[in-house]
Structures are given as structure tokens and as C-alpha cells.
Amino acid sequence: MDKIKEILIWTNNEGKYREICDLLPNHIKKYSPKKFGILTPEETGKSFEENSFIKASYFSKKTNFICLSDDSGLEINLLKGGPGIYSSRWSGEKNNFNLAIKKIFEKMSDVKKDWQNDSAARFICCLTLFLPNGKFFSSQGIVKGKTSSTKKGKNGFGYDPIFIPDGYKDTFGEMESKLKMSIDHRFKAYFKIKKYFL
């Protein structure tokens, strides 16, 4: 495989885009979806891996670019793995994660009133690197932890303010970006395919 010189990072989530750009080497030229007027295909997969593949393959074929796609989300034990692959959709059309977080707290309270003592959760990220010749590489990263009882911190994005990784007291929302990105699910997924970008 030739050295990657430029790549299309397909995600409409600006937080994810920034984090992926920070993970990739500086010598690679990065493009965002804003450069292309292409609608995102329906995510019909039943797993993060399937949805990541759907997006990466679709946009690589449409643009003839090497494409890296991210599909990730939060799984909460008490909610039987929810919101899971629907993590982004819980935020509504306007990506209002304050709304999504409120919904999580309400649903956990519906299942168990003292859910604060039963809040095990995990973040999952699946990355798919798809080449115009049809070859692809996928990887998955998982970080285990629990949900906090309230929103904490203003860093990160999405559900970061309510997720506390195992071994830490702070939420991802309270952590410095450098620390978070050295232990989170996206970093773990990237680390497994890092060799293709060097």
C-alpha cells in the first residue's frame, strides 16, 4: 500500500472530525465532508462496524478518495446497550446532546430509581479505512467506565460530560484533551490501524 498523502474524513460531527485530525500525522492532507455536496447514506447497519463500513465505502466510491469513517457511541448496561448505534440520533436533528443526555437520565431513572449505583457503561468506536481499489481495514476501540449522575465539564463533545472512564474520577468532559485522547475509544481504534498512516 502506497503512503497516504491525503484523506477524506467522513463525519458530520465536528468534534469527531477534530479528534481524528489530531490523531492523524501532519503530513497527510485532510478533507472534511464540507468539500463535497454528497448526502450521507442511511445507516442501516446493526453494529458500529457495519455503519462505519457503509459510510467509508460509499464516500470513497463517490469521491475516489481514500476515506476514513467513524461510527461510535455510548452503551449503557442498564439500558441494555442503549443508546448504542443510535447515540447520535438521540440528539435529534439539531444534534442537541443536552437533550440526549436528559433522555438518558430519564430512561435510566425509569428502569431504576437509584440508577446512580448501577451506571456501568462503555464507549465504542469503529473506524473503517476504505481505499478506491476496494480494499478496506476496520478496527474497534472500547473504553469501559460509568455514567456520572450529572453533566460535568465543558470539554469534548457529545456524551463526554457524563462518561467517567475506569480508573479516573473525572468525566471526559472535565479532562484535558491530551489526556482524553490518549485513553479513549477513538484513540484505541486508531492505534490498531495507525501503521497504514505512517
What are the residue ranges of the model-derived segments?
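Anionic-ligand binding patches
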Residues: 2-10, 14-198
